């Protein structure tokens, strides 16, 4: 008999199991497939989103921003490669510029740190090889990437080291 059953051994299930395994509880991680990270987690984009696209004030916004802020330390603890390369949303015309302004306002409301709108010149200084048609951008320096497969394997492994069963 277990105190907690974590359903799914993807990146979310792995991180939940890892976090809960720090407490004095018995945990069973249940996975339908024959290995961890074989579903959506192995096929996702690897982007750690900054949080500017989530609905203002939503739980998703809160957790995305907080998760983005935590990810570097979590990866360091688990020995997983983490790259804080930032993210850019590129605009090509006035309509795109208005969309980027909306994303900027939403990101500010969601407390995304250091978010800024870039002019064409600022964009080219940051990314010299960007399309000649690009006119503006939204820059989120807190955006990053991490291999979801490696993160899942490490987090499930850490949970198991702490006594969780898979």
What are the functions of these language-model segments?
Residues 2-29:
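N-terminal Rossmann-like FAD-binding beta1-loop-alpha1 element of flavoenzymes
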Residues 10, 33, 46:
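Proline-glycine-enriched beta-turn/loop adjacent to the NAD(P) cofactor-binding site
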Residues 33-35, 123, 155:
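Short beta-to-alpha linker loops that shape the active-site pocket of alpha/beta-hydrolase fold enzymes
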């Amino acid at each position: 008999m277990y105190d907690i059953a974590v359903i799914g051994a993807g990146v979310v299930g792995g991180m939940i199991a890892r976090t809960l395994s720090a407490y004095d509880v018995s945990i069973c991680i249940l996975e339908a497939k024959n290995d961890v990270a074989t579903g959506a987690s192995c096929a996702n984009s690897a982007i750690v989103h900054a949080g500017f696209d989530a609905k203002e004030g939503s739980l998703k916004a809160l957790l995305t921003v907080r998760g983005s802020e935590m990810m570097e330390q979590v990866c360091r603890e688990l020995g997983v490669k983490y790259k804080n390369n930032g993210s850019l949303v590129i605009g090509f015309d006035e309509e795109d510029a208005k969309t980027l302004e909306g994303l900027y306002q939403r990101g500010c409301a969601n407390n995304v740190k250091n978010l800024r709108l870039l002019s064409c010149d600022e964009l080219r200084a940051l990314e010299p090889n960007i399309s000649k048609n690009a006119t503006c951008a939204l820059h989120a320096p807190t955006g990053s990437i991490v291999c979801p497969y490696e993160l899942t394997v490490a987090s499930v492994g850490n949970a198991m080291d702490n006594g969780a069963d898979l």
